[in-house]
C-alpha cells in the first residue's frame, strides 16, 4: 500500500504550490522555541537567548530578487524540476518573502544562535 508521502517522493515537483505541500516540520516540532520570542515572528533585535533551541522569526525579504543559479544535481536528487526556478513564488520564498508561503508552510522562519553557552559556561573552541 502506498501512502501520500510515497507518491510525493516519486513525483517531480513542478511548481511552488506542489513544493509547499512537501513541507515537513517534524524536526522543528521536536525542538523548543525560545519562551521570550514574539508570537508573530517579528523578533529582529539582537539579544541573548537563554532558553530554547530557536527563535521564530519572519525573514527580511529581498525587495527585487533575481534568480542566479542552482545545482541541477541537487534538484534532481530532491526531485525538483528546474522549471521551479522560474516560479516567482519559489524565488520570492527563497529570497525571504515568506508571505507567499502556502499551507502547510509555516508563516515564519526560524533562527538559531551562533554562540554556545551551557549552564553559563561559554564555549568558543
Annotate each predicted stretch with a short phrase:
Residues 2-125:
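Nucleotide/phosphate-binding site architecture used for ATP/NTP-dependent chemistry
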Amino acid at each position: 500500500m502506498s501512502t501520500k508521502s510515497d507518491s510525493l517522493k516519486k513525483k517531480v515537483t513542478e511548481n511552488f504550490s506542489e513544493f509547499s505541500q512537501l513541507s515537513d516540520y517534524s524536526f522543528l516540532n521536536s525542538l523548543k522555541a525560545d519562551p521570550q520570542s514574539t508570537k508573530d515572528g517579528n523578533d529582529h533585535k539582537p539579544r541573548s537567548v537563554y532558553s530554547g533551541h530557536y527563535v521564530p522569526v519572519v525573514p527580511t525579504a529581498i525587495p527585487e530578487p533575481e534568480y542566479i543559479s542552482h545545482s541541477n544535481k541537487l534538484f534532481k536528487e530532491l526531485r525538483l524540476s528546474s522549471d521551479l526556478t522560474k516560479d516567482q513564488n519559489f524565488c520570492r520564498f527563497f529570497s525571504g518573502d515568506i508571505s507567499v508561503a502556502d499551507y502547510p508552510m509555516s508563516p515564519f522562519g526560524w533562527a538559531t544562535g551562533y554562540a554556545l553557552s551551557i549552564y553559563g559556561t561559554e564555549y568558543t573552541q
